Amino acid sequence: IYRRLRGEVPFTFQEAAIISKELGISLDRIAGVSFSNNAMFDINVVDHGNPFETYYDFLNKHVKLFHTLREDPNASLGTASNVIPQTLYLKHELLAKFRFFKWMYQNEHIKCKHFEELEIPQKIINVQQDFAKLSHHIHSTDYIWDSMVFLHLINDIQYFSDIHLISDEMKQNLKEELLILTDELERLAIKGKTDFGNDVHIYVSQINFEATYSY
């Protein structure tokens, strides 16, 4: 530790992250780094005390970004994913709620209720709609999907049904929304354009993805 403090041995990334967290030190400011011209990477640090606000802030940040890009003819959006992208499912209220519900269930710091008992604030529903709509204004979008992208979602819904956190009626409602979404995606794939006339390219990969990556 002494040699690190003297600068003879550099801190590892993990050590620097711990120091930053515990002491409230901004590593960006120490390094004098400005990210105004760099691509944005988001490590989802979650405020467990208020997950709704964390989720809202995440969506609202991207809504503001989409606003700035909607008239840019060079703007492009790309994602390689093993789940259905937010740009496509967020306008469907139940599917969006399910993804949020699943995240809360997986987070050990948040006590999760039954799916029907989870009430999504209206401002989150509104920003979800804005997110989905504005993303379609991007001049060009490229999607690369895991071939299991729909099966992953179906299996997740069935799992929560099996452990009685989703009722049979609600499972049927989710199924109906998913069928509507697949119809929309079929039309999108055939046209190759959004309703605003912007290009969309969809590729289904035979290689399964470990995670989702976007730019």
Describe the residue ranges of each PLM region.
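Short, highly charged low-complexity linear segments
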Residues: D28-A39, D57-K61, T79-A80, P121, ...
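Short, structured coil/loop segments at alpha-helix boundaries
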Residues: D28-G32, G49, P85, I166-K171
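Hydrophobic protein-protein interaction segments
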Residues: W103-Y215
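Basic, Lys/Arg-rich alpha-helical nucleic-acid-recognition elements, primarily the DNA-binding modules
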Residues: I1-V46
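Generic structural signal of hydrophobic/aromatic residues within well-ordered alpha-helices
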Residues: L27, F52-Y55, L59-F66, L174, ...
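Helix-turn-helix/homeodomain-like alpha-helical modules used for DNA recognition
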Residues: F35-E116
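Arginine residue identity/basic-tract feature
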Residues: R3-R6, R29, R70, R99, ...
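A sequence-level detector of short, solvent-exposed, charge-rich linear segments
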Residues: S20, G24, N38, N74, ...
